[in-house]
Amino acid sequence: AFEAGADYCTVLGCTDLLTIEGCLKAAEKAGRRLFVDMITVEDMDARVRQLEAIGVTHIAAHTGTDRQAAGGTPLEDLCILKAAAKKSVISVAGGIRPETVETYLAAGADVVIVGGGICHADDPAAAARAIWDKLQGE
């Protein structure tokens, strides 16, 4: 992915630490960044400690679409990650829309990732503008 121009890559946080270390080394070699996606990770506190111990600096709270359909959001996971991380950038993804983005900013998200909140909006351009404005504090 890095050879194709990607600035970031993602690896699942539930995978083996050796796999994550390999991905981290590839990112470092390319001068790029790796995000560890914590979707389905059960003991986030312990996993964050393990990840930071091997040099991970970017961790993502992420709620999948099935969990969103059942009413789940990434807010609780974001709060857990923010409390557990000592030196990592924490991103949030999953179900974020223009009307909810401020909640995640207030909870301390360093990076907000929006997909369906733009792509599935009635007016994707307006949704993107609204999110951008909120990220800029407008």
What are these regions (language model features)?
Residues A1-K87:
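Conserved anion-binding
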Residues V11, D37, S91-A93, V114-G115, ...:
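Thr-Gly-centered strand-to-loop micro-motif
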Residues A6, A107-A109:
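As written
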Residues L18, A46, T73-E76, E99, ...:
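Conserved active-site and cofactor/substrate-binding residues in soluble primary-metabolism enzymes
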Residues D77-L105, V112:
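A C-terminal functional module that forms or caps the active site or interfaces directly
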Residues C23, L78, L105, G116-E138:
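C-terminal helical cap(s) of enzyme catalytic domains, especially alpha/beta-barrels
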